[in-house]
Amino acid sequence: MVATGQLPIPQITARRFGARCLPALTDDALYERTGVRVAFTGRAGGVSEGPYSSLNLGNHVGDGPASVERNRALVLEALDAADVPLVVPSQVHGEVVVELDDASPEALDAAREAALAGADALVATVPGIAALLCFADCVPVIAVSPTGRFAVAHAGWRGVENGVAAKAVRALARADAAELGEDAANGYNVYVGPHIHASCFETGADVRKRFEDRFGSSCIPDERHVDLLEALTVGLEEAGIDRARVADAGVCTVCSCDEFFSYRAAGGICGRHGAVAFRKAG
């Protein structure tokens, strides 16, 4: 079912899915209203071993391809989406947004090719497509419209600075404009998954200055750190998002590296957890 009115205020809660009781963070009220399932996975519930243990979803980190494919399948099975085609981009810390506006096999092949060429956000304007992006400290962002359209973005500090999530929201709003008007983004729910928090994100003075110049002093908590969530939220507000509709998981990946992958905590060798969104066709 797709909502025609206002979405419920976003809330991120922990749940276990499927026969394997796979843990993930989600919003059940959103799913009940729109049919859109959003999920932030952790590192438990998969088959990978060593530094990738166990639910590694990234195929670019040194884990075995068969393990990654099995882990991705386990996630879709647990979320009751085993039959939903999956699109996973090659993330490049850029600002390219790939729009998924046709679920036909030919269009999906073209979209996958575009995503594999390098993209850090996917915008799905039709049902029947699942989007997965992978993370280990960077900021996962999922935006959902009352129409059931959605966007998933990967924002490292460069992506936050360059506004990749805001760019995805603007693309989503263009798709919604005929139904929801020019201020469509004001009614979107935004979900921010586990990421490196300000207390663990120490940067050089040059990066702090760039963030302060771009987003204001609210994202600079002290003379050593940058608050990526605050900077991201400022950028999303510029794209029309209501700050009251931005829900943060409240989890720092560095501090919680036993539950989520953290590049910084692991010293560079680790798996990737995921941000997943889909709406089934029919």
Where are each of the predicted segments found?
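Active-site microenvironment for binding and transforming phosphate-containing groups
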Residues: M1-G282
